[in-house]
Structures are given as C-alpha cells and as structure tokens.
Design a protein with these regions (language model features):
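Non-catalytic beta-sheet/beta-sandwich ligand-binding modules that flank or precede catalytic cores
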Residues: 1-220
C-alpha cells in the first residue's frame, strides 16, 4: 500500500519526512479494519507498507478508511510545513479508485451433515443419502473426505469442484448397526486431499472440520 504526497491541492509531488512515530494507513477490511504502519525511516514523496490479509478480513473492493500519524510523530516538508495528524484523502485518490482488490480472509467451515432419506429402518443393501453442506463453495481435490459413521463404516466423499454441498451414498452392509445414524467425531481428509474455497489466488483451506452442535444426521 503506497501513499503519495503533493505540495498543496493539485500540486506537484513533494518530498516529506516522517520525523518520528508512524504513518498509519487503516484499510477497510471489516470491523475496526487493518492498519499498515510505516516507520520513521523514510524521506520522499511516496511511502509504502505491506498489508498481510488476516483471518476474517473481507472487502469487496479494498479502500483506505483513514490516515493518521501515530506515536506522537510529525510529517514535514523541507520547509518545515507540517502535515495534519489526520490527513484527508482527496476525492478520487483512494486505493479503490485505482485498483480492484477483493479480500476474502474467511475460511470455509462445515455447516451441517444431513440426509434426504426417510427416517426408518434400513437393512443390508439399502442406500442412505448423506449430504454435507459447507459455508461457501469449496473444491475437494486429489483424494476423499472421510466420514466415520456410528454404524462402523467409513463413508468416503469423492472429490468435487466448486460446490457448497457434496453428496455420498451409504450402502448398509452386513454387521452394520446403529440406532440413529450419525457421523462420529469430525470428518477427515484422506492422504494428499485438499479442501479449499474457490478464490482465484491463494484460496483458503478448510481447517476446522467440526460439525456444529445440532447439525449431524441424527439431529434432523
């Protein structure tokens, strides 16, 4: 993230000096936003700092919500003229006026595991639908997502692409028993599998495989 300084309104680029403290750029990423702080070791007409996307940061088009000089610092030009402690951003000169950065730091999660099959007793060879719903569209690649059922069977969910739901069919086999079918524990990825959302760059991994309370097959 870069800030350019000019001499007056509509003037030419001007070198300034951050004498102490920090020059703080607050980005609109939801909530209180994220602040990029530039330290006092620069002199020039442009100052820049790095923004690292954090968990739960979101923005449909990243912009700067505020500028401030922190740590009792000052910014002055070569003539000693001091910049306001809370500089205003000129109209049309914000980050989102020049760039279209979309931020999605929200990792996908499991919403529920349900079944569309009727509540009844199933015997050997009968099929039961199992549907897993995610908080956003995800892609399962390379290997399966495994659901351990309380009937003693591990149900594999096959790889799929760009969907917020995935389907699997459980066939009851000999010696399978359950008074009320449910997934035990949390689903797990088979070796080499990845489960990510569908961002164009740097997709977010699903890392919390917890099934929310009241959202298991047996709860419906």
């Amino acid at each position: 993230v870069a800030v350019s300084f000019i001499n007056g309104v509509g003037g030419a680029a001007e070198n300034v000096n951050l004498n102490s403290g920090t020059f703080d750029i607050t980005l609109a990423t939801g909530g209180a936003g994220r602040t990029v702080s530039i330290s006092s070791d620069w002199n020039g007409s442009t100052a820049s700092g790095d923004y690292v996307v954090a968990v739960n940061d979101v923005s449909s088009k990243l912009s700067v919500s505020g500028l401030a000089i922190g740590g009792s610092g000052t910014v002055t030009d070569t003539y000693g003229n001091e910049l306001s402690a809370t500089p205003a951003i000129p109209v049309g000169a914000n980050l989102d006026d020049a760039e279209n950065f979309q931020i999605d730091g929200v990792a996908p999660t499991i919403v529920s595991i349900t079944s569309s099959s009727n509540d009844t007793t199933y015997g050997i060879g009968d099929d039961i639908n199992v549907t897993i719903t995610f908080s956003k569209a995800v892609t399962l690649a390379t290997a399966n997502l495994d659901l351990v059922l309380n009937s003693g069977y591990t149900l594999p969910v096959a790889p799929f692409s760009a969907s917020s739901t995935a389907q699997a069919t459980y066939e009851v086999l000999a010696d399978h028993q359950s008074a009320d079918l449910a997934v035990t524990g949390s689903p797990t990825l088979a070796g080499g599998a990845t489960l990510k959302d569908n961002l164009n760059f740097f997709p977010n991994d699903l890392t919390d495989f917890t099934i929310p309370a009241g959202q298991n097959i047996s709860d419906a």
